[in-house]
Amino acid sequence: MMLILMRHAEAISEFGIDDHTRDLSGIGQRAALDLGRWFATQNFSPTLALVSDSNRTKQSFLGLKLSCPVKYLPSLYLATATRLDSEIRKANTECLLVIAHNPGIAELAHTLAGKDLTHPRFYAYPPGSTLVISAGKDARETSVHDFKTPEDLIS
């Protein structure tokens, strides 16, 4: 299975706003569009998306402009790497996109990619970070295709 692990794009951070309802910032909206264009140029075509039910993750998915089915899951909101892995294992699809939050999405990405990635921002996993891998039954069968942050896509 092809697996795409994406941290939501940059969100607004205003005092007093409930975390779950935070929207994307203008930068985050542009980043989601840029990532969607990158998906298209690389022929990354998710057949299913599992997305946290927070506003910023939903908006990140919508910004990608993908046509795949999507499931907005409350269980992915601030999910641990273990919870994310559990949801991924339930999915039976050819190319799965998961959009979630740090630290869980970053921890899972680091576990699956191992030491194969030398990108200077990989361990920070900033907003919009996206890892694309071929996932086998266990971590030893995983190979990295690509990793990008929104900053990598600015021309």
Predicted regions and their residues:
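Glycine-rich phosphate-binding loop signature in dinucleotide/nucleotide-binding domains
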Residues: Q42-F44, K90-E94
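Non-DNA-binding regulatory cores of transcription-related proteins
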Residues: T93, L97, N102-S129
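Conserved histidine-centered catalytic loops in small-molecule metabolism enzymes
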Residues: P46-P69, T111, G136-S155
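Active-site-proximal alpha-helix that buttresses catalytic centers in soluble enzyme cores
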Residues: M2-T82, A106, L117, Y125-G128
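Domain-level recognition of soluble alpha/beta enzyme cores
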Residues: D116-S143, P150-E151
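Short, solvent-exposed polar/charged micro-motifs at secondary-structure junctions
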Residues: A81-R83, I154-S155
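Short amphipathic alpha-helix with an adjacent loop that forms part of the alpha/beta core around
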Residues: R83-A91
